[in-house]
Every structure is written in C-alpha cells, then in structure tokens.
Amino acid sequence: MALLQIAEPGQSAAPHQHRLAVGIDLGTTNSLVAAVRSGETATLPDELGQHSLPSIVRYTQDSVEVGALAALSSAQDPQNTIVSVKRFMGRSLADIKAGEQSFPYEFAESENGLPLFVTPQGQVNPVQVSAEILRPLIARAEKTLGGELQGVVITVPAYFDDAQRQGTKDAAALLGVKVLRLLNEPTAAAIAYGLDSKQEGVIAIYDLGGGTFDISILRLNRGVFEVLATGGDSALGGDDFDHLLQAHMQQVWQLSDIDSQLSRQLLIESRRVKEALTDAAETEAKVILADGTELTQIVTKAEFDAMIAALVKKTIASCRRTLRDAGVTTDEVLETVMVGGSTRVPLVREQVEAFFGKPPLTSIDPDRVVAIGAAIQADILVGNKPESDLLLLDVIPLSLGIETMGGLVEKVVSRNTTIPVARAQEFTTFKDGQTAMAFHVVQGERELVADCRSLARFTLKGIPPLAAGAAHIRVTFQVDADGLLSVTAMEKSTGVQSSIQVKPSFGLSDTEIATMLKDSMKYAKDDIGRRMLAEQQVEAARVLESLHAALAKDGDLLNADERGQIDATMANVAQVAAGDDADAIKLAIEKLDEQTQDFAARRMDNSIRVAFKGQSIDNI
C-alpha cells in the first residue's frame, strides 16, 4: 500500500498515458540527463554516444558553445570559457573575489552585487550560463523520448541555500521548462539504490563531485527515505585535487609566471593525470609551452595520495560530525553509497572503507547514480506511478525562528526537521495601542539573535490598537520540498496579514553551518544564562511600563507614602534590571508585585464602581 503518493494535483496519469519527464544532474564538472523507459532507468546519450555533458560554456562573437566543443577551446580562450559555473550560483562578486582561488574571467557586478561574466556576447550571469548547459540536455531528452517534456527534476547539492536553489529553478524557467522538484544529490542517489537494491536500515551517501562534497545519513525503512542529518563542504571536490596536481607540476617544472592559456592547459593535464592514476601506479604528465618546448614528468600514485590526503581527511571528519548529528555510529551504517566521479580515486575509497568498516557500494555508476535517482523521482512526480510506495523526507540544516523582545530567538522550526513542513506559533504585542509589529526571521542554534544568521525582515501593519498582550498574531513558517522558506504573520481578529519569501542574496557554506553548530554546543551554558537574563530584563521592562500607565491613570488611589514606596521599588527594579543578575531581577519584580497587589485590588474595585455607577440591580 502506498505510504504517500507524490503527484501534483491533476497529474494522476491515465492508464494509457505515459507522461514525459526526466531527471537532470546539473553538476559542477559534468551534467547528465536520465529517464525511465519501459520500466528501466538509464542516462540518455547524445548523438555521439556520450552520456555526460561537460558543464562548460564558451561565448564567442557569433555563437555559444557547450560541452565537449567548449572544452576543446578552453585552453586557448579561458577568459570566455566558463567552467564550474555552479560554484558561482547564489554568491556575491565580493565573496568570489575574497576567495583564495583566482579565475581567468572578466567580471562585472550586477545591481544587487552578484557576478556578471563579461563575454563577446555581453554580460551574462550564472543563471544564464546554467541555462545554456540545460538547453542541450533538454533537447537531447526530447529527441530521444520523441516528445515535449512535461517536467524535470533537477538535482542540487544538499547545502545549496535558497538563493542557489532559486537560481537553479530560474535557469530552467529561462528555457520554459517546468521544474517538478529540486532534489538533493545525495537523496537522489538514495532513491536509485533504494529502489534497485531494496535496502533497509541506515545508509550513508558519500558524494564527492567536481566542486562539492556532501555526506548524508539516511534511514530507509519499507520504502521510506528519511534524511537523518546532512553535512559536507560546498567548496571541496575533485576540482581541488586537480588544482593541487597543477601546483605540483608547476613547482617541478619551475613555472612561475604563467598566462591563463598555460594555466588552463596545466589544469586539463592535471585532470588526465588524476584519472590515469585511478588504475595505474604512475603516469607521465606532459605539456607543451608556447615556444614549442615539451615538458614531462612522472607522477606516482603515492605522490598524488600525499597531495590530497588532507582534503580526503576533511571529508572523513565531516562524515564523523554528521553521524554524530544523526545519532548513529558507524556500526549501524549498513551500506555506504559512493556518488560522484571523484569517488573513483583509490585513496578516497580506501579511506571511506576504513572509516565505515566495510567496502562502499559502487554497483551503480557513481557518475550516473544521481541522474538515475532524479529520473525515478521525475517519473513519480509527473504522474506515471500513482501507486508509488516512495516517501521522501529531507531535513533543514539549521533551526528557523523569530526575534522576540530582548533580542531573544524563538525557534519555530527546529534543526533536522523533515521537509516539507509548516509550523505556526502565536505572538502578541508588547505595548498598549501597538498597531504594527516588525518581524526578524533568523537561522541558527544560539539563544540570542546577535549570534544567529539574519534571513529577512518584514512588518505587519493594521493591528487593532488594543492593550498590550491582547492582540494575537499567528506566525506560520512553511518550508517547501525545495527548501524555500515562506513566513506569514496574521492578526487573528481582523485577518490582516503580511508575508515574505526568504531568498538570501548570499550563500551559507557548510563551514559556516559547522561553525554555528559547534558554537551552539560550546556556548550552550553561557547562552542559557544570557537568555534568562534577557527574559528577566524584558519582564522588568514590561512590568514597569504597565505600572507607569496604571499610576498615570489611577495614581490618586494611593496616598503619598504608598506612592513613594512604590516609586522607590520601581526605581530599584529599573536599577537591578540594568545589571547582569537574572535572579536579582526576578526577586525585585516579585517584591514590586507583592507591594502593588493592594493597588491592583483598589483599581479593580474602582473600575467596577465606575462600570455600574447609576445602574439598578434590575439592570445588571
């Protein structure tokens, strides 16, 4: 029996109708397209029989070259040949320039600070470049399948933020293609293996591609895929192995001042050497300089292993952290799935096997497994499998919440909550007559806003001018299947509402996520103390403001001595609240409350007298 039928409304397929949909692995280094045909899932080759399309785009005066054709010209025209554009998606130009890696491109800056590539065809942004990579994949699929696609599932790294995910959707939109869903790459691999191998239990997905590393811990049970935790490094991949090899060759050949053309030639040779060392103990590296000089050197597997050992060790450290987040041990992991071309590197497989204590799964081509999983998901979403037994649950990496008085964070959606998800919480006004409320959406695990990441701000206006605490504002957080966040605030009595969709301009790297998680544990005790202090300070401010209003209205109910005692106690509360002793503030508030109980009773009696003045018993 189906646990969940994943299909858009109105998309249930008729028995005689097969809808066309594909899965696309939009990779940093290479991209693939796959489809389900006659019950079999496979990647689709081009006219030359090539399954993978190099994620490379070259702009010339008269044309746009994509894939292998662009790769052939990359060494001669590096400035106009854009490689690994995925690394630029959702990042600011300032962030790119501040990075350690240099690029041969000429950049311009958009109005919102995002990078623009200056090409012979004008300025283009990463979204447009990504669309050029998608274009031949879509065309290939429609030609192979014999019709127009009704939707695609595109995979993205698990740590892509909202801006990066939206950019990927926008790239497809430029081509008029409907995106059924964005799917995390490790999760796509889990779908491929889950259906083919019928695995149950805890599975680790080790995904080392050209530009990113993702580790996901999933629990598979009776066709249910639940992501327990995710981790990784959005700036670590096979490209980094290539750059280390390139630096090694430059050092051996004593090449100091090199132009962009030679740099690209060295990079291409580095990739060839890396691939050759997958099966050989050593190989010869060779480049030809502009003057015709031929340079050669022997690179051994041992040398290459030494170069990349630190990077591979970083991936294993991420695995260890993510297992801890998931609350499982290596002994509980039944299988480790290898994803991405860089997992072919022998040292990677050796270290993964040593860490998890068992050989990793490689029965599905690690270069194609993500596209295959995406194709399976696309086939379900487009309506071809109405009785699907596949339930997919992803998680959010960091808690989402709202700033409250005192700079505190009220978490609405907790970290590692499965998505899609909707959570709601009620808030109220702080002051009498308050007609608007500002909302600050934050992300993180700390107790104070200052220690969390700001996502967005918006304001709800039109709140009825009631007494403090009388208005009820319902705030709803909704995270869709693609990880995009919508926040809505609604005043319950009037229905007035305001909302915002969070699309950050700047990416959040896994390194920042790891740092935020570490800090939340490191400063947990201090944070609780700071929160308790802030809560008492807010309560003191609320009590004093309320009492000031009461005295202004009904102060004549007190004699001079009583008023003097209350004023003195109020002054003491204000003085203590300015300090850093939460317990002292609490005691001061309690003393003030005790001292003003008689005043509160008189106010109540007076209010009753005023309300019933001039009325007879029969009218009450």
UniProtKB/Swiss-Prot annotation:
SUPFAM superfamilies: Actin-like ATPase domain, Heat shock protein 70kD (HSP70), C-terminal subdomain, Heat shock protein 70kD (HSP70), peptide-binding domain. One of its GO terms (molecular function) is ATP-dependent protein folding chaperone. Keywords: ATP-binding, Chaperone, Nucleotide-binding. Disulfide bonds: none annotated. One of its GO terms (biological process) is iron-sulfur cluster assembly. Pfam families: HSP70. Signal peptide: none annotated. Chaperone involved in the maturation of iron-sulfur cluster-containing proteins. Has a low intrinsic ATPase activity which is markedly stimulated by HscB. NCBIfam families: HscA, PRK05183.1. Belongs to the heat shock protein 70 family. This is Chaperone protein HscA homolog. The lineage of its organism: Bacteria, Pseudomonadati, Pseudomonadota, Gammaproteobacteria, Alteromonadales.
